[in-house]
Amino acid sequence: VRDAYIAQNYNCVYTCFKNDYCND
């Protein structure tokens, strides 16, 4: 669960950077 959370969080940050937006 913890690893999944980290992976999901990293993916969110990557998407944020890629799309040049961030909501969190």
Swiss-Prot record:
<keyword id="KW-0528">Neurotoxin</keyword>
<protein>
    <recommendedName>
        <fullName>Neurotoxin 5</fullName>
    </recommendedName>
</protein>
<keyword id="KW-0800">Toxin</keyword>
<keyword id="KW-0738">Voltage-gated sodium channel impairing toxin</keyword>
<dbReference type="GO" id="GO:0019871">
    <property type="term" value="F:sodium channel inhibitor activity"/>
</dbReference>
<feature type="domain" description="LCN-type CS-alpha/beta">
    <location>
        <begin position="2"/>
        <end position="24"/>
    </location>
</feature>
<dbReference type="GO" id="GO:0005576">
    <property type="term" value="C:extracellular region"/>
</dbReference>
<dbReference type="InterPro" id="IPR036574">
    <property type="entry name" value="Scorpion_toxin-like_sf"/>
</dbReference>
<keyword id="KW-0872">Ion channel impairing toxin</keyword>
<dbReference type="Pfam" id="PF00537">
    <property type="entry name" value="Toxin_3"/>
</dbReference>
<comment type="similarity">
    <text>Belongs to the long (4 C-C) scorpion toxin superfamily. Sodium channel inhibitor family. Alpha subfamily.</text>
</comment>
<comment type="function">
    <text>Binds to sodium channels (Nav) and inhibits the inactivation of the activated channels, thereby blocking neuronal transmission.</text>
</comment>
<dbReference type="InterPro" id="IPR002061">
    <property type="entry name" value="Scorpion_toxinL/defensin"/>
</dbReference>
<keyword id="KW-0964">Secreted</keyword>
<dbReference type="InterPro" id="IPR044062">
    <property type="entry name" value="LCN-type_CS_alpha_beta_dom"/>
</dbReference>
<dbReference type="GO" id="GO:0090729">
    <property type="term" value="F:toxin activity"/>
</dbReference>
